[in-house]
Amino acid sequence: MKMMTIYIISLLLMIGFVAFASKPSPIYGGLSLVVSGGLGCGMVVSLEDVFLGLVVFLVYLGGMLVVFGYTTAMATEEYPETWVGNVVAFIMLLFVLLLQVGWYFMSKLVYIIMAIKLFDFVETSLVGQDYNGVSQLYYCGGWALALLGWILFMTIYVVLEVVRERSY
């Protein structure tokens, strides 16, 4: 059941990426990226790494929502272009999905590699990924957390500078 869940999430992830690549209006492009990011986090959670999936979901999608909120507000269109005009991308998507589903049912072999599960014994110690994640994030990865926060702030600042109106 777990293997099928990950397979379905990966198919939905591919649909989200093709929806973004078909160059719709910025509103729909941002929506497809947010949905794809959520599906990617769902895949990480289904591989038994709940803490990492939650951190990525909160930080990445929170930052994306702020950036896309500002850029969408600055780039609103009266009649936004939808995905209907991009028939070639959808035909390509349907073809690839048909190939994947056909491959799955023809071979019946889908491998998922998991090195360390939750509460596995590695040599002599017990590995609990979720409970040690918070302390490791602030202890060993505190500098990376501060750096990523600064990068997210600078990204928002640069986007605002690029899209603001200049009055001369």
From Swiss-Prot:
Core subunit of the mitochondrial membrane respiratory chain NADH dehydrogenase (Complex I) which catalyzes electron transfer from NADH through the respiratory chain, using ubiquinone as an electron acceptor. Essential for the catalytic activity and assembly of complex I. It is found in: Mitochondrion inner membrane. It catalyses: a ubiquinone + NADH + 5 H(+)(in) = a ubiquinol + NAD(+) + 4 H(+)(out). Core subunit of respiratory chain NADH dehydrogenase (Complex I) which is composed of 45 different subunits. The chain crosses the membrane at residues 1-21, 27-47, 50-70, 87-107, 143-163. PANTHER family: NADH UBIQUINONE OXIDOREDUCTASE SUBUNIT ND6 (PTHR11435), NADH-UBIQUINONE OXIDOREDUCTASE CHAIN 6 (PTHR11435:SF1). Belongs to the complex I subunit 6 family. InterPro entries: ComplexI_Subunit6, NADH_UbQ/plastoQ_OxRdtase_su6, Nuo/plastoQ_OxRdtase_6_NuoJ. Keywords: Electron transport, Membrane, Mitochondrion, Mitochondrion inner membrane, NAD, Respiratory chain, Translocase, Transmembrane, Transmembrane helix, Transport, Ubiquinone. It is a multi-pass membrane protein. GO terms for molecular function: NADH dehydrogenase (ubiquinone) activity. One of its GO terms (cellular component) is mitochondrial inner membrane. This is NADH-ubiquinone oxidoreductase chain 6. One of its GO terms (biological process) is mitochondrial electron transport, NADH to ubiquinone. Gene3D superfamilies: NADH-ubiquinone/plastoquinone oxidoreductase chain 6, subunit NuoJ. It holds the Pfam family Oxidored_q3. Its EC number is 7.1.1.2.
